[in-house]
Design a protein with these regions (language model features):
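N-terminal secretory targeting modules
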Residues: 1-94, 135, 284-300
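Structural recognition of the beta-strand scaffold that forms the well-ordered cores
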Residues: 48-59, 95-100, 138-143, 148-151, ...
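Extracytoplasmic/secreted proteins, especially bacterial periplasmic and envelope-associated proteins
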Residues: 51, 78, 82, 168-182, ...
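Short acidic/His/Gly/Ser-rich catalytic and metal-binding motifs that mark active-site loops
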Residues: 58-61, 107-108, 148-154, 205-211, ...
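Conserved SGNH/GDSL esterase-like catalytic core that processes O-acyl groups on lipids
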Residues: 61-178
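A structural motif corresponding to the C-terminal end of an alpha-helix
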Residues: 84-92, 179-198, 227-245
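Active-site segments of SGNH/GDSL-like serine hydrolases
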Residues: 143-147, 156-157, 184-223
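Catalytic His-Asp segment of secreted/periplasmic serine-dependent ester chemistry enzymes
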Residues: 201-300
């Protein structure tokens, strides 16, 4: 999720942090990584947790957001630190590395596209986060999609797609899928087979930040998000990858779960997300995501 472009301090911190980490650290393949698929962690075990994400991982919109690369942020109210505290309360010994970068998108292609249409994007998951996943990670969470939807709708508003906007949107969804494949492959190259929890995205057409926009923009956002969920994220479900279904959970559309910008969750919204992430981490039978639900057709 994006941060407010009127926050210069946050932008400076993000850009400097990305530059330092990009220049000062290694690429893939460091250390010894696990090789066996990871199911739910055993009760009381050690959980080595890497969180890949954008401003949602930092808890932007909450009462206690975490600064970029404040890898612990013990009192943060975003879903990543709340998840960590809940796991510890259940007896797990959790080591957290929060890699979230506000404004980030999944890959360089979306970063370049967004910058072309004047969106502030400080980095991407593949280039600035994937390489820092702990080699001994036993748990990785990933939340991508909303910033990418906003990039594509901004491009459409700037004339991209020409006479075939649907074809353009569908091509961007395929690019998102390619990037997701690259991201997961890189994480597994680095960390072996950790338990991976990915979050599909809610339908932006039902979120407060688009409430005052045109029907065409909401239709475009819905088309992109639903396609990303159905064709990219949900099919990732496997024995060691769990999908949290934000798209079809009615709680994703409760207005009071969002901060004043209408995009980022507030404390209540992040608490809801964290509760589902914890269940996905610890359950041996977490429900599969739905591929059809009323939330997929919020606008006609």
């Amino acid at each position: 999720m994006s941060v407010n472009s009127d926050s210069p301090i946050l932008r400076i911190v993000v850009v400097i942090s990305v530059m330092v980490m990009s220049q000062g650290c290694d690429k893939l393949g460091l250390g010894t990584s696990p090789t066996q698929p990871s199911g739910p962690p055993a009760a009381g075990s050690t959980v080595v947790y890497s969180a890949v994400g954008a401003s949602d991982a930092n808890g932007v919109g909450s009462s206690v957001p975490c600064a970029p690369f404040d890898t612990q942020c013990e009192n943060g109210m975003g879903y990543v630190p709340v998840t960590t505290r809940q796991l510890r309360a259940q007896g797990f010994n959790v080591t957290l590395l929060n890699l979230g970068i506000p404004t980030a998108v999944i890959g360089r292609d979306f970063q370049t596209l967004g910058q072309q249409y004047n969106r502030i994007i400080a980095g991407n998951f593949i280039d600035q986060e994937m390489m820092f996943v702990q080699p001994n990670a036993t748990l990785v969470t990933i939340f991508a999609g909303i910033n990418e939807v906003n990039v594509v709708t901004a491009a459409l508003g700037g004339g991209a797609g020409g006479s075939d906007p649907n074809g353009y949107m569908d091509a961007q969804v395929r690019a998102f899928g390619t990037d997701y494949t690259t991201l997961l492959a890189g994480i597994r190259t680095r960390a072996g087979s950790p338990r991976i929890v990915v979050l599909n995205l809610p339908n932006p057409a039902g979120l407060p930040y688009l409430a005052g926009t045109s029907l065409a923009q909401r239709q475009a956002a819905q088309r992109i998000a639903v396609a990303m969920t159905r064709t990219v994220v949900n099919p990732l479900l496997s024995s060691n990858l769990v999908v949290v279904d934000l798209m079809c959970d009615s709680r994703s559309y409760i207005p009071s779960f969002y901060s004043s910008d209408g995009l980022h969750p507030n404390d209540a919204g992040y608490a809801y997300i964290a509760s589902e992430v914890v269940k996905a981490i610890t359950s041996s039978s977490y429900p599969a995501p739905q591929n059809s639900c009323p939330a997929m057709t919020i606008v006609p």
